[in-house]
C-alpha cells in the first residue's frame, strides 16, 4: 500500500512542480514561439532540443525512483523512507534540480528567448539555496552516515563521469 501512495503522491507532485515549472511557465512566457536563434547560430536550437530530450526522461526516472525505491515523493511534505542512490543519483545528487532547469534552458535555446535563460538561472538559484538550507541538513539528520557517504562520493550539481558504486 505504501508504494501505491508514493506513486500517486509523486505523480501529483510531478504535475504541480516540474510540469508547471518546466512546461506551463515557459509556455506562458514564450507561447513556444520561435524567435531568432541566439547570436544567429541555428545550432543552438539543436543543443536546446538535446537538453530537453535528455532532461525530461531524467526527471521522470528520478520521480519514479523516489516512489518505487524510496517509498515517498520528492515533496518535502511526503519524503522518501529510504535514501535513493540508484539511477541518475549515482552520478549527481540532485538530478531533478539539474533536469528541470536543463529543460527550461533547452527551451530557451530552442525558442531563442532570453527570458527563459533568466528564468532557468533564477529557478536554479532557488533550488541551490533550498538544497543548502533545507534539503541537505534534513537528509543528514534523517539518513545519517548513509547520506554522508553518498554526499562524499556524488557531486551536488555537476555529474560524475562514472557511476558511483554503492558499497
Model-identified regions with their sequence ranges:
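Membrane-anchoring alpha-helices and their flanking helix-loop junctions
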Residues: 1-86, 98-167
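Solvent-exposed interhelical
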Residues: 89
